UniProtKB/Swiss-Prot annotation:
Species name: Arabidopsis thaliana (Mouse-ear cress)
GO biological processes: response to nematode
Record's bilayer topology term: Multi-pass membrane protein
Any Gene Ontology CC annotation: chloroplast thylakoid membrane
Name the record gives this protein: Zinc transporter 6, chloroplastic
Annotated compartments: Plastid, Chloroplast thylakoid membrane
Lineage of source species: Eukaryota, Viridiplantae, Streptophyta, Embryophyta, Tracheophyta
Family of the protein in this entry: Belongs to the ZIP transporter (TC 2.A.5) family.
Primary location group: plastid
One Gene Ontology molecular-function label: zinc ion transmembrane transporter activity
């Protein structure tokens, strides 16, 4: 629980850091720096897919990048977004009021975010099942290992064209799933990117903004790698790829500009209880979405259902270890940024 007592030394330090003119200059720098690093991060995997698709080790490289990105997204939700949401709702100006002091709303809204992401997943999966042309089972049957050849079930009377149709159907379902993952992931990222941008845009604290520029630039690179890796595998049309990458790149900078406009128009106080409540609730909701996406649609899907990682033998074992190391490095690198942002 946040303390309601403000020390004299802390108050003096806060007053010295509050410089609207310098803060505005820093925020303009932040807009361009974060935009450029976002473009670099999200377009990296997409360009890799465009120019190296079909080359040796391409699929493995994309998988390793995706596992690194899953670690980044998991750390973003648990180390960055969720603690800030709890902190906002635990502030003494909020936690001293009803109903905020009576119930842990941050945890509740995080759970709602995760369940909402699950609902979207289930709805889309049901839609794919009915529209996949594979009957009521959606074309995704359980296949005993002894009856599977090359990832396809060998049934009596099925050969040649039948197997090719089944393979194409399964590939299309996988692509649709990857597209859904990319879209829901971007929604979760956009939620908390807007919060980050608007919060920075409204802040007049130069001591807070200065280190945030560097930290958020790295943050956007890592998060962009995560989203870009998913987009690269999803097989979107060129226009959709450009749109999704552009949306990711401009969301935080536009949030900063919006925050500056709100402050200029209203003199908005970022310590206002209503602002803290809104930040806490939106942060909790986006955290729930990101936790679900990282654990279920990225980590579990790749480590337990990807053919390259479930293949028996030394090659599959080495790749699995490499992907696990990438996951840990992604989590650690993003967690380290919590020291500054």
């Amino acid at each position: 629980m946040a303390s309601c007592v403000t020390g004299t030394e802390a108050a003096i330090r806060a007053a010295a850091c509050r410089d609207g003119e310098e803060a505005s200059h820093l925020k303009i720098v932040a807009v361009f720096a974060i935009f450029l690093t976002s473009v670099f991060g999200v377009w990296g995997p997409v360009l890799l897919a465009k120019y190296f698709h079909g080359k040796p080790l391409y699929d493995k490289a994309i998988l390793v990048i995706k596992c690194f990105a899953a670690g980044v997204i998991l750390s973003t939700s648990l180390v960055h977004v969720l603690p800030e949401a709890f902190e906002s709702l635990a502030d003494c100006q909020v936690s001293s009021r009803h109903p905020w002091k009576d119930f842990p709303f941050a945890g509740l809204v995080t759970m709602i975010g995760a369940i909402t992401a699950l609902l979207v997943d289930l709805t889309a999966s049901e839609h794919m099942g009915h529209g996949g042309g594979g009957g009521g089972d959606g074309g995704m049957e359980y296949m005993p290992v002894g009856k599977a050849v090359g990832g396809l079930e060998m049934k009596e009377g099925k050969c040649g064209a039948d197997l090719e149709i089944q393979e194409n159907s399964e590939e299309e379902i996988v692509k649709m799933k990857q597209r859904l993952v990319s879209q829901v992931l971007e929604i979760g990222i956009i939620f908390h990117s807007v919060i980050i941008g608007v919060t920075m845009g409204m802040s007049q604290n130069k001591c807070t903004i200065r280190p945030l520029i560097a930290a958020l630039s790295f943050h956007q690179i890592f998060e962009g790698l995560g989203l870009g890796g998913c987009i690269a595998q999803a097989g979107f049309k060129a226009g959709t790829v450009v749109y999704m990458c552009l949306m990711f790149a401009v969301t935080t900078p536009l949030g900063i500009v919006l925050g500056m406009v709100i402050f200029a128009a209203t003199g908005y106080d970022d310590q206002n209880p209503n602002a803290l409540i809104m930040e806490g609730l939106l942060g909790s909701f986006s955290s729930g979405i990101l936790i679900y996406m990282a654990l279920v649609d990225l980590i579990a899907l790749d480590f337990f259902h990807n053919k390259m990682l479930t293949t028996c033998g030394e090659s599959g074992s080495r790749l699995k270890k490499l992907c696990f190391v990438a996951l840990v490095l992604g989590s650690a690198s993003m967690s380290l940024l919590a020291l500054w942002a």
